[in-house]
Amino acid sequence: MVLLPLYDVDPLEGKTTPFVTYGLIAINVIVGIAVFSLPADTYKTLLNVIGLVPAIETRELPRLGLFPRDLALFSAMFLHVGWLHLVSNMWFLWIFGDNIEDALGHLRFLVFYILCGLTASAVFVLSAPHLTTPMVGASGAIAGVMAAYLMIRPCTKIEVLAFVWPVAVRAYWVIGIWIALQFVNVGSYADDGIAYWAHIGGAIAGALLIIAMRPPNVALFECMSPPDVGGNTIS
């Protein structure tokens, strides 16, 4: 990504402790440590058993072992293919998740996150029903978090690295560009292995769910100017 988010500068941040966000990050890291320590063959087998294999979900292939077939829609959200994949996903969740948790409350945020992830998994299966390799990662759920952030904090400044320079950019640029790139690149899964349809499905779910689940005091598309931060600003 050309714009690498570092942190957000939110005037409403810090109202509640984001226990669920921290818990989700901790679970993903613990699972990552556990599976990355496995022998390579065992790790590969595990991904095929509890990762999301569309051909298994569509009944083209038999399920492997006793793992419930449709549970992979959920379990795939907590698996990653390496440390870079894990750390980058958790970094985005750490930046954007606390704001959505603060807006929705702890329990509703947990439900929101899981529903975004399940939708992302389902959309990916529909987009590639014959695929025989596993899809794993939290990015579909996190795409939903980012879409919700765009809708309730569109003008919040995000400190990003634009190539090598720190710049404060409005959230609608950072997240808007990221979402647009998912649509631009949606046909390139075979080339880069990135599940763009999962991201799109998660983002659409997040946009719809934040409308349905937000408390009455949480406004949509409301711009509030945060305190000035270092670096240049793009509005």
Segments predicted by a language model, with ranges:
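A detector for small-residue-rich transmembrane helices and their helix-helix packing motifs
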Residues: M1-S235
